[in-house]
């Protein structure tokens, strides 16, 4: 019998059916990838499995290790050996690695915590997940990839038999991702099953035994991973064939709009360290300029200098339309028609408790005001409605808190906010991070449309196929230096990486 069986699961929120008659099976030591667009029902299904939505809140049956599972809460499922690691990690940053791993599961003898035993156990767990860290290290001092490994060690400490990973590599470097995927394969060898949720289809293909696709709350199908291509997965996810993930519309590249000369930036704290080292480049109207490089190459630092949001010291010459400008803060950048979609949308891009509409107009309120204080609400509503329609933001209402939207729809709303400022230069830092394939495709189409309208666009992405798929020209950076500016005529990933790494 299978380790996990979920049979005919249906979940409703009021009159809205979030899941309809979904069934999945998983064997011990098997890796099942769960794919679907944001809002398809993946998270709802996992919340049912983990006891976040308790027995009675849904219809259908769940069997785990040949016994019926009627979980009332997460504690019930953890005791059975089911653990979930969310995209937003749940570790307590101010506590040590050891304290996080044993939180709520302390080893005690006669009412006293067995500190030495926990320390040795923690060392052993960290060894299992290949994390070279002292158990007494504060979690906040670790990188995201290392914190992810602490979460897995915590699950192993609870005798996990089924590990659920939700977008585990969204914020990880390529090296950290490789370590994590190898660890999952190692867990598989020890008969631990895994449900893997990711929008990165290359990872899904590399790691999975089976791939299950959910669309609009319905089970589209589960197939052997070896029989599926990435295009097959995309077609099942979106319900239509996408002939090219990177749509390319011809657009005219016109005059130079931006020129940067000798831009340098220093670390905000360790001021002797250069994060950007004497970088010079140009950008033209209607051009899509990709910026490629490994983590730490200085890409984000460079564009933050252009937008006036860099926290440390920076210097250099910036010219817009051949005229030298002084940009020391975001307000000055916006005055010069430069806008930016930031890398961390939740931290820097949205006010999560505010409505979608208010987020869209937040940066351009001055243009909807009578005088300095009174907002022209009719004009504001018109702008909001037009922006939501143009960018296809899926929301029940403009007043819905933006934090309740999917990542893709949040990103579209941030783009709408930027476009409400009528920019001439648009900077996009990781524009599709944590976004499903359908939303990515729509954002790529929008980037092309904006280039056709003459907007100059800078795109930073950790995904090389994305940079190569949408850019007219690619800047290659490494350790703060600009290594090359390459015209994108049949550029390959290998050529870009070779350029970045060669001395």
Swiss-Prot record:
GO cellular component annotations of the record: plasma membrane
Keyword Repeat: yes
Catalytic activity: D-xylose(out) + ATP + H2O = D-xylose(in) + ADP + phosphate + H(+)
Principal location class: membrane
Domain ABC transporter: 4-241, 258-499
GO terms assigned for molecular function: ABC-type D-xylose transporter activity; ATP binding; ATP hydrolysis activity
Membrane topology: Peripheral membrane protein
Top-rank taxon: Bacteria
PANTHER family for the chain: CARBOHYDRATE TRANSPORT ATP-BINDING PROTEIN MG119-RELATED, XYLOSE IMPORT ATP-BINDING PROTEIN XYLG
Family: Belongs to the ABC transporter superfamily. Xylose importer (TC 3.A.1.2.4) family.
Summary of the function given for this chain in its UniProt record: Part of the ABC transporter complex XylFGH involved in xylose import. Responsible for energy coupling to the transport system.
Record's protein name: Xylose import ATP-binding protein XylG
